[in-house]
């Protein structure tokens, strides 16, 4: 996003041992690099934008993002790890990784949820889609309860987007980028994305409902 923390930067991940030995020196070298690059102005960092770029420790990065440094989750762990964090650590591109330690963890995560976890999540999303979208949204609109209808519609949209990501075996990103990212998915992404956009723009229009 260009709204914040955007500008020339990159990440260099080191093992814990290398980070302790050469981390400080590499951090100084990174800070000494030109702040602008090919016409892009210097990165404007928000107060909480630190430790996102530069020289980082592999273990600390994964532990901060997903709670573990090895990605060896139990079935319960897979259920509760924040999905947007899984999206964060699997998006983007790794340019060079001759050691392979960083990419090995990333590849485990890119393999996606264990199938039992994926099916459980899909069943949960379908249940909410049915109750919030097919049932309660229509009931609220017929009664003219637009605030309650908007809540139901939001639940339906969130769970529908999540379902499409699960069908594509891709992690759903932070809510600001969910819809835009869904449009790029090969299975139902563009089709469902268009319907959701139309629903979001017209979903609480009382003129379209018989509220008697």
At which residue positions do the language-model features occur?
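Conserved NTP/Mg2+-binding pocket subregion across the NTase superfamily
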Residues: 19-142
């Amino acid at each position: 996003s260009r709204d914040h923390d955007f500008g020339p930067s990159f990440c260099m991940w080191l093992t814990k041992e290398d980070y302790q030995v050469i981390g400080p020196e590499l951090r100084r070298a990174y800070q000494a690099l030109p702040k602008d690059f090919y016409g892009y102005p210097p990165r404007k960092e928000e107060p909480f934008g630190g430790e996102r770029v530069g020289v980082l420790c592999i273990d600390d990065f994964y532990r901060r993002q997903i709670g573990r440094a090895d990605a060896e989750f139990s079935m319960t762990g897979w259920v509760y790890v924040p999905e947007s964090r899984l999206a964060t650590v699997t998006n983007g591109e790794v340019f060079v990784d001759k050691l392979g330690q960083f990419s090995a963890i990333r590849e485990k995560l890119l393999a996606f949820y264990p199938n039992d976890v994926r099916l459980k999540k899909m069943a949960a999303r379908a249940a909410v889609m049915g109750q919030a979208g097919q049932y309660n949204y229509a009931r609220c609109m017929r009664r003219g309860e637009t605030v309650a209808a908007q809540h139901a519609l939001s639940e339906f949209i969130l769970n529908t987007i999540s379902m499409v990501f699960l069908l594509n075996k891709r992690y759903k990103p932070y809510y600001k980028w969910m819809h835009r990212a869904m449009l790029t998915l090969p299975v139902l992404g563009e089709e469902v994305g268009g319907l959701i956009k139309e629903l979001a723009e017209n979903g609480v229009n009382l003129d379209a409902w018989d509220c008697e």
